[in-house]
């Protein structure tokens, strides 16, 4: 079985797949310790043979995780490295090593799935948008705060905005009428900012390609903007798809 890891800014997503890419087990944790516990439980049902990982964390954190996986599970990790070109996509950054590896994996996966021009949107802790031409040229993209960061900034940098963000998660209720409480006002305002950003990316993609492009949507908050992009393909595991392309397992 193959252990796959997506180590993002806030969470570590993990899953166990078989040789046919069928997902046997998966989860989301906040720390290496929680990951070890989850994999210990998964190991009772599945025998691990390989591990591949994409991470946006520091070199020290990656080295620590690789060491833990080797010592605890006997796994040698195949990790994504920066590249100027991969699977037909040419990295659009002036310094290709500076493009976040999670974005790179999403771009590579989307291009493989579309085989043409595509707009790639990932709504997580940060929100990213990337543009790829039909010939695989990555035009670059945009990064802005995601919903968790928008909430946090308002709570930390204003004196009188205090509310339970967990309890407020459902306060939009599909409505974007002006909020009648601080929590409603913040939640609806932040979601509207995300939706406006996404709409602007759609218009830019149309300027580039007319209607000849596909849209890929991923990330934990993708559902908040899906109706803004009725043509979008929602692919929750887009980064894992890219990971499989970047780090194939020898047969």
Swiss-Prot record:
Cellular-component GO terms for this entry: cytoplasm
Cofactor names: NH4(+); K(+)
Enzyme Commission number: 2.7.1.33
GO biological process, any: coenzyme A biosynthetic process
Gene3D superfamilies: 3.30.420.40
HAMAP family: Pantothen_kinase_3 (MF_01274)
Primary role: Catalyzes the phosphorylation of pantothenate (Pan), the first step in CoA biosynthesis.
Name by which UniProt lists this protein: Type III pantothenate kinase
